[in-house]
């Protein structure tokens, strides 16, 4: 399950938690269970088989809920990034795709949301430089939603946005 909303004056945390509460209630008919934080900082329900992930930008919050490990990351399409970051965060394969891309800003944002979602999925976060992960610019797990690039990754099948 996927939900998104504009922040409308709320913090990303507040909006994300509101989305999570709504999704969990819709999926289970139950109130939101307690949330604990793992050793590497990944939040999880302490007594539920459901998994969730939240991401927010300056304008939007996104939440996914599933019965398998799942992760989401989002970036506003109009966000301008320092393109020199490509040298530090992209694998050689990704760098070749980045160099060939007509829209380098979008290319870097695409790789970034995939790397962030992958790090969230693992539960370990990004440690060191994330250039040891390799993705493709045409990865079907990245979609446009509400003016954002959104990546959703699961342990199992691709989650359709």
List the model feature ranges, each with a label.
Residues 1-161:
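Core catalytic alpha/beta fold that binds nucleotide/phospho-ligands
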């Amino acid at each position: 399950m996927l939900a998104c909303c504009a922040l409308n004056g709320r913090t990303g945390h507040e909006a994300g938690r509101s989305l999570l509460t709504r999704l969990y209630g819709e999926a289970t008919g139950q109130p939101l269970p307690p949330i604990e934080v793992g050793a590497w900082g990944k939040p999880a329900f302490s007594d539920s088989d459901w998994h969730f992930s939240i991401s927010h930008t300056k304008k939007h919050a996104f939440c996914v809920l599933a019965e398998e490990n799942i992760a989401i990351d989002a970036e506003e399409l109009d966000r301008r990034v320092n393109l020199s970051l490509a040298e530090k965060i992209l694998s050689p394969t990704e760098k070749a795709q980045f160099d060939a891309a007509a829209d380098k800003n979008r290319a870097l944002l695409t790789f970034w949301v995939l790397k962030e979602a992958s790090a969230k999925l693992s539960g370990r976060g990004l440690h060191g430089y994330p250039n040891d992960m390799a993705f493709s610019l045409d990865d079907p797990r990245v979609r446009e939603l509400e003016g954002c690039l959104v990546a959703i990754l699961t342990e199992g099948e691709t989650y359709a946005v």
